[in-house]
Amino acid sequence: MLENPLIQQVLFEIMDEDVVGFDVLSVLINTNEVTDDEISRQLDVKLNNIRRILYKLYEARLVDYNREKDEETNWYTYTWKPSLEKVPALVAKKMKNVLNGLKEQLEMEETNMFFFCSDCEIKFTFEDAMDSGFRCPQCGGMMYEYDNKKDISLLKEQINYLEDEFTKNPLFSAY
């Protein structure tokens, strides 16, 4: 399941783009139940970093923990375990949001005329370009009509890819 690029992307975002998170998940999956301290030692990563990743995963409900108090030291030990059955639903929700955003962007691209400042590389709608007299508000340079056919084509490809993935991938069949 973790080999799926869509799942990897969503997990990467959940873990604040920290690739160590995948190592943490691997340890959790392979051991099924482990303390944060054991993960830290096994991966040779600072305990604070491991805990930060685990808390992010917990917020997404992708891991659970048990807390036990050591009666001698009065310290708590947290034992973590994976709870990855929620991953497909989480990814499906994220995919739907991305898909909706892409469809909105496609509609915007298809229903508007755009202008472009080649110096600043900023794209403007016709209305915004007209309001500024077809001069870039950043640099004052002249704006030129922008051909967005490639943008439209790319958006359609991305939408088709996500829709295909959503309908054909067995991970998402229930969603």
Swiss-Prot record:
One of its GO terms (molecular function) is DNA binding. It comes from the Archaea. Keywords: DNA-binding, Transcription, Transcription regulation. Residues 3-88 form the HTH TFE/IIEalpha-type domain. The keyword DNA-binding applies. GO terms for biological process: regulation of DNA-templated transcription; transcription initiation at RNA polymerase II promoter. SUPFAM superfamilies: Winged helix' DNA-binding domain. The keyword Nucleotide-binding does not apply. Monomer. Interaction with RNA polymerase subunits RpoF and RpoE is necessary for Tfe stimulatory transcription activity. Able to interact with Tbp and RNA polymerase in the absence of DNA promoter. Interacts both with the preinitiation and elongation complexes. The winged helix domain is involved in binding to DNA in the preinitiation complex. Transcription factor that plays a role in the activation of archaeal genes transcribed by RNA polymerase. Facilitates transcription initiation by enhancing TATA-box recognition by TATA-box-binding protein (Tbp), and transcription factor B (Tfb) and RNA polymerase recruitment. Not absolutely required for transcription in vitro, but particularly important in cases where Tbp or Tfb function is not optimal. It dynamically alters the nucleic acid-binding properties of RNA polymerases by stabilizing the initiation complex and destabilizing elongation complexes. Belongs to the TFE family. This is Transcription factor E. The lineage of its organism: Archaea, Methanobacteriati, Methanobacteriota, Methanomada group, Methanococci. The gene is tfe.
